Amino acid sequence: MMVIRPVERSDVSALMQLASKTGGGLTSLPANEATLSARIERAIKTWQGELPKSEQGYVFVLEDSETGTVAGICAIEVAVGLNDPWHNYRVGTLVHASKELNVYNALPTLFLSNDHTGSSELCTLFLDPDWRKEGNGYLLSKSRFMFMAAFRDKFNDKVVAEMRGVIDEHGYSPFWQSLGKRFFSMDFSRADFLCGTGQKAFIAELMPKHPIYTHFLSQEAQDVIGQVHPQTAPARAVLEKEGFRYRNYIDIFDGGPTLECDIDRVRAIRKSRLVEVAEGQPAQGDFPACLVANENYHHFRVVLARTDPATERLILTAAQLDALKCHAGDRVRLVRLCAVEKTA
């Protein structure tokens, strides 16, 4: 059975293996053991209540409960940009016009922005390619909404998610090549690694301070503004079906889109509810997959179960209850895994 649980210190080697499979561009999952160990420690201290809000971050892993294999990772930053500035570009417009010459040009322009300062962030989503099946990707991504719904007061009103931009298997980023490299004088992979290992001071020091007309970039770079890496397209679709939208903010490195949503408008958060759980044999039928989570802050767990999402009393097997660290009579959080498709 696949289970979402909080990260533990013993997971560092598994996270290193996952990091080696990302193919680059996933800034918050660098293949650096010291950085990953520090990330785990920060998550543990967050759960223990030892950090200020500006440093808090939760990390979860997807584990096969039978073998102990860690198949994926996901995380939530509680409030970005309160310690180090959180930069992105806002894609806006500058108009240059002359009535006398009968010239009017509306030019797409990139403005350096810190507009998302203080927002909660969904980040570090990665599922081992060998485990991309049977709803694991949905479970990994959406489990975070169950945690946010259960502990709503720990998060801010806006949630953002940076999507990985277009970068090839050799680490080539058209957007970086045309823009970032001119200011940073280093390859994309180097800048990405420095940022991922916490060495972010160079961003504020070297970033262009003035608006940038996108027409001055290569056509290849212009074409990838707001576009996602092919492997990230499913993750973007998942978030958009939950209510997230692209509001013309992009990553400063690879030009990937930043999606955002008011936390209380996220479908899985808004529609999740608490039901009593009982042990038994679940009813057979053509039921949809649902997310089921406990309400235990320190021992949070999420699993998938096929059941009626409108039930008032959820029947789970002994194995499912054990995976959730629940007992009969406890209340669990339940929501349909995927939104019901509307028909005309």
UniProtKB/Swiss-Prot annotation:
The keyword Transferase applies. It comes from Shigella boydii serotype 4 (strain Sb227). The active site is at 229 (proton donor). It catalyses: succinyl-CoA + L-arginine = N(2)-succinyl-L-arginine + CoA + H(+). One of its GO terms (molecular function) is arginine N-succinyltransferase activity. Its EC number is 2.3.1.109. Catalyzes the transfer of succinyl-CoA to arginine to produce N(2)-succinylarginine. This is Arginine N-succinyltransferase. The keyword Transferase applies. Belongs to the arginine N-succinyltransferase family. Keywords: Acyltransferase, Arginine metabolism, Transferase. The gene is astA. InterPro entries: Acyl_CoA_acyltransferase, Arg_succinylTrfase_AstA/AruG, Arginine_N-succinylTrfase.
